[in-house]
Amino acid sequence: MKVVLFCGGSGMRLRGYSDDVPKPMVQIGTRPIMWHLMKYYAHFGHKDFILCLGYKGNCIKDYFLHYDESVSNNFVWSKGGKNVELLNRDMDDWTITFVETGANANIGQRLKAIEPYVQGEEMFLANYGDGLSDVPLPTMLDTFRKSNAIASLLLVQPTSSFDIVDAGPEGMVREIRPITRTDIWINGGFFAMRNDIFRHILPGEELVREPFQRLIDKQALLAHKYNGFWQCMDTFKDKQHLEELNQGSAPWKVWNCAANSSVDCNCPPLEQRKEQQIVVSAHV
């Protein structure tokens, strides 16, 4: 199954970290956040990636062209450094397609730009490239496959520290509660789409605006609510939180389940983690 990652954003609210690299290349630990996302998808069998490049796209190309497996894997060093034997690898069987989609393009334009690379696919996966989750992907895909929807998106509850204030007509406050304790759901940036999505995107349109509204009007947009772990990386505070998690439980690292049976996760049994038929369409 193909996975489209939108990698063209500049990360304006992460200035200082994203001055020299695109937002998806900002590191969590020793690897960029997009690497963590790709490991997540690969864990479930989806290892064919299409990267929608934009702002400083050459940084992403250079990273993979000079990828150093030793940074995140065990290895044996011998003969004074003349021999380095990797004991395991991150992406032996990954396929990555790099597509320039424009420095200032929006998500809808980037998606249209890669349409030729997903022709023939019935469905595909897509992701904003700046958020991590441990959502059980096969469950989300199974629900989508059984529906007549053209697209499905992950809904999560906001992780903001803001409070909701309920005030009466005269201004007297009736209740204050954390936004996380409300029935508010936001777009989590994880998508599954059928190829028909491209017929609903006109030139210049932002994906979640006009195209998704057309799907809503046709009752063809499916929501998958998930109240487990999800965290975006929009601000310095978000990055700091992800760094702290990376030092400990790192809930999004579902791939650790395969290496350590003692790790608790939301993964289905191995036999259910087969690659599923999901497709992405694009247009360069």
Regions found by a protein language model. Give the residues of each.
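Short coil/turn segments at beta-strand junctions that form active-site/ligand-binding loops
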Residues: M1, K47, G120-M123, Q219
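Catalytic-core segments of class I nucleotidyltransferases/pyrophosphorylases
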Residues: E122-L125, L132-R145, V156-S160, M172-C267, ...
